[in-house]
């Protein structure tokens, strides 16, 4: 128990030292602040470097992430077909694909997949 306590203390001290070193080494000087401003061939910037982001791109990205995660969960199901009951595997696969199709239908119905709005 004493050994575990000593190891935990040493790990804690090493963590604190590394965090303090990272803080000291990552300090920005006044000269580095010029790097944060946009640079356009030596001229002052005409427009802001931050452009507004269309909400349509954000919605498409969120829909892509949701369906991408669902597909990533669906792919390993092919590997477990050998070890599981065929009826259970079939019902689970159909249920999962059915949920995917319901989500796709809902997004299509809401008009989230139409770009010309």
Swiss-Prot record:
One of its GO terms (molecular function) is NADH dehydrogenase (ubiquinone) activity. Its EC number is 7.1.1.2. Its main location: mitochondrion. It is an enzyme of class 7 (translocase). It is a multi-pass membrane protein. The chain crosses the membrane at residues 1-21, 57-77, 86-106. It catalyses: a ubiquinone + NADH + 5 H(+)(in) = a ubiquinol + NAD(+) + 4 H(+)(out). Keywords: Electron transport, Membrane, Mitochondrion, NAD, Respiratory chain, Translocase, Transmembrane, Transmembrane helix, Transport, Ubiquinone. Core subunit of the mitochondrial membrane respiratory chain NADH dehydrogenase (Complex I) that is believed to belong to the minimal assembly required for catalysis. Complex I functions in the transfer of electrons from NADH to the respiratory chain. The immediate electron acceptor for the enzyme is believed to be ubiquinone. Belongs to the complex I subunit 3 family. This is NADH-ubiquinone oxidoreductase chain 3. It comes from Anopheles quadrimaculatus (Common malaria mosquito). The gene is ND3.
């Amino acid at each position: 128990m004493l050994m575990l306590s000593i190891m935990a203390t040493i790990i804690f001290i090493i963590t604190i030292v590394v965090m303090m070193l990272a803080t000291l080494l990552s300090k920005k000087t006044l000269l580095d602040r010029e790097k944060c401003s946009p640079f356009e061939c030596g001229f002052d910037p005409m427009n802001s470097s931050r452009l507004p982001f269309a909400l349509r791109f954000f919605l498409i990205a969120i829909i892509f992430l949701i369906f991408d995660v669902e597909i990533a969960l669906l792919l390993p199901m092919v590997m477990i077909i050998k070890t599981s009951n065929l009826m259970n595997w079939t019902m689970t696969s159909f249920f999962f694909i059915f949920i995917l199709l319901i989500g796709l239908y809902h997004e299509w119905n809401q008009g989230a997949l139409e770009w010309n709005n």
